Amino acid sequence: MRRALLSGLLALLTAAAPAHASQLVTWTTTSRYVDPAQLDFNGPPRPKALRVNVLLPDGYTPSRRWPVLYLLHGHGDAYDSWADPKNGDVARVARGFPGVVVMPEGARGWYVNWWRGGRRAGPAWERYHLDELIPLVERRLPILRARRWHAIAGLSMGGEGALFYASQRPGYFGSAASFSGAISIQRPEWPSGFDTQGERHDDVFGDPDAQRFYWTGHNPTVLAANLRWTRLYVTVGDGVAKPSEAENVFGQAAELDLHQHAEDFTAAAREAGADVTYVPRDGIHDWPYWREHLAAAVRWGFFAPARESPSDWTYETVAAKGDAWGWRFEFQRRAPDEVITFSRHGGMLRGDGSGRVAIKPPHGRLFVVKLPFARRL
């Protein structure tokens, strides 16, 4: 009898215990494109290293494949800000989230390859995150392959990064979200305001007149057509702090400005035919509201069905190399000095702009062509 009671109690305890609680792990990565020794990291003194926080979900096991969310931080933050209980508190806010959450370092880099007088380097964040980090994640973790299972989101500067990266890898990311994002970066007040934050606009995006093409090629609002087949979630505050939260003059002013960014982007994305969920809310530019934004986006659902391989798309870029819906391209001799447009409509592939480019189709042999071109598939 006693043995039977002990066995029954053990069975109850086993049934009540979770399979595995979520687990936060930190990776240190290397890069050919970003030198951590040259960076000014945000937050307390920390080693000069490119670190990534990875939140493994409840019940994680490497024997099955998982969805993935890339979660980007803002201008004054670091790779550990989303996981910090005082800031993003992601483990609590997204408790029960059904996928892996990858939170990389972005310093104050704006998630772009810095113009730097035309070198497009020093640092090249886009190359690090898209060409090095994503492949590293997929080598180390069993990630589901279809684009519906790949999402990206971010706050403020990270909102710009999330929508920009989604625009440059539309065949990879099925969903993208911006929380108080800087997502309409060619508004008249932008360059002068940008220069007050510590970086020079000319270094990051180029001179607003002489390198307007480079600036344009990183503006999510202008690139909205790239996101036609991407599920989009955009949320922003109204610049008014809730009575229960502390007031913050900078946070109020910043959110008022970024509210217009959200309006600009949402209008452009809807005009392009994208599926946009736009949620203007109460609040200012501060962590209590971003936690709410993330929780609401989780309820919206990062991994709902998304079109896998549309035969009708437009892709604009200033990148020297990239991937447009599985059509990998690399410009020969020199990088573009204008916004390049690739498009597919049924059985016809087109390229508009100038330059010589090598293109590798998803299925087929590499070919080299001079722009502009039209090629029947």
Describe the residue ranges of each PLM region.
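Family-specific functional microsites
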Residues: 18
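Bacterial N-terminal signal peptides
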Residues: 7-15
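Non-catalytic cap/lid and distal C-terminal segments of serine-dependent acyl enzymes
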Residues: 21-358, 365-370, 374-377
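Bacterial N-terminal signal peptides that target proteins for export
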Residues: 1-6
